[in-house]
Amino acid sequence: MEHNILQVIALAEKLKYEMRHSWLSNGRQESVAEHTWRMSLMAILVEPYLDQKVSIEKLLKMVIIHDLVEAEAGDIPAFDTMNSHELQLQKQKNELEAILNIKQTLTGSLGEELYDLWMEFEAKKTYEAKVANALDKLEV
């Protein structure tokens, strides 16, 4: 395909078996894909109650791609990076390399859009990014 979309779809499949540091109510470990799905549902459900108007399309895109880098970089739990500055820097480096690879794979405006959304999520400056980050913390 023109933008190597199938490569990114194949990469995203890894999120189905990339396990997170959290467990479901039935005791089974959660995958990154399950985490992302539930965050997406939460975004739809809370959007009407937010203090400010958001672009639900942008919010959902941000939620969906925020952990795409973990398909390549793996999931390093936040509580591991809290006590290790070195591990925090390694996580940032790995994830930045991963999003740059995704951007390069997709090329053009689609690659730019995913890169920009991921960077916006990481910066936590816009209202959508703040909401997405809050949902990420709530969905553990």
What are these regions (language model features)?
Residues 1-140:
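Alpha-helical, largely C-terminal catalytic domains
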